[in-house]
């Protein structure tokens, strides 16, 4: 009997799986997949829940993989929601709740497609599902842990589709063939405290750090590349923690976030930031220290067989030819790319992470149909 992806989405939304809680979501999926003949393994690392499931022979020449997550961000003020954020209620043509868009509907669609496919037309190959409970958090023990375990166990995917929401307005209009890298830089400027009436007796870290931030934010990192828009730098914090208006503080901090294309690496950008900080230190005498966190490098799956496979299936089911894009934030596809070609395609993501997150019910079954067609075409 075919799996209803709408009902499964609602059941998953009712699982309160706010990172790092599993909330019963992976347990539910594991029961469904095990009952359909998938070999399931829980790959939990450092208390983070993950699920690996494979139908077919280990080491098959052709193995199609799906990747997704069941963890969700916090609901915020629950009183601000029109409906129960974990109710999975269907009303007015929408399915409401935290994770409805990001990305329990996508997971439900590919679970349903995978089960129906292997039961109706068992392929000459394998189908693998990697589902994590740690995508919205630090993402260090989620998909990374699954891929580490797979490498150790001799498991592999030939290609992978990540079911994240990718479409801005209409189902079918966009797929992701890559993502920008992300770096957060934390600057700490240490000067000499003093009276504001005698600035020559102090070393003002505020002025020094402001000079550095101005230099960074006025610099064009690049003009974009073949498949990427221009890299961006945004100032996100600037703090002194100084309640006094007549005191030059000794300490000032600032944070910038850089979203970068394939013209850069995290290391090359960190080197540039260090050089700029050193220049300002030389000019002002204020020591400026940098601590950088690279959340992920940019990556690209060049247009080819996988993206064409996805595009044909999307067009056949929706009438739209999806634009291959690298826009937006980062995703777990950045980890998968080191193991096999990866493309992302999913629903419209306009309400993800918002109060009253919801997904249009009429999109969920077509998404399952797209995934099912992709599987059929891949193994044809």
UniProtKB/Swiss-Prot annotation:
Residues annotated for Zn(2+) 1 binding in this entry: 69, 102, 164
Amino-acid biosynthesis in keyword set: yes
Record's keyword terms, sorted: Amino-acid biosynthesis, Cobalt, Diaminopimelate biosynthesis, Hydrolase, Lysine biosynthesis, Metal-binding, Zinc
Residues at the catalytic site: 71, 135
Cofactor note: Binds 2 Zn(2+) or Co(2+) ions per subunit.
Family annotation (CDD domains): M20_DapE_proteobac (cd03891)
Positions of Zn(2+) 2 binding: 102, 136, 353
A GO MF term: succinyl-diaminopimelate desuccinylase activity
Pfam families, A to Z: M20_dimer, Peptidase_M20
UniProt cofactor(s): Zn(2+); Co(2+)
Gene3D superfamilies: 3.30.70.360, Zn peptidases
Role played: Catalyzes the hydrolysis of N-succinyl-L,L-diaminopimelic acid (SDAP), forming succinate and LL-2,6-diaminopimelate (DAP), an intermediate involved in the bacterial biosynthesis of lysine and meso-diaminopimelic acid, an essential component of bacterial cell walls.
Quaternary structure note: Homodimer.
Protein name (database record): Succinyl-diaminopimelate desuccinylase
Organism: Cereibacter sphaeroides (strain ATCC 17029 / ATH 2.4.9)
Taxonomy of the source species: Bacteria, Pseudomonadati, Pseudomonadota, Alphaproteobacteria, Rhodobacterales
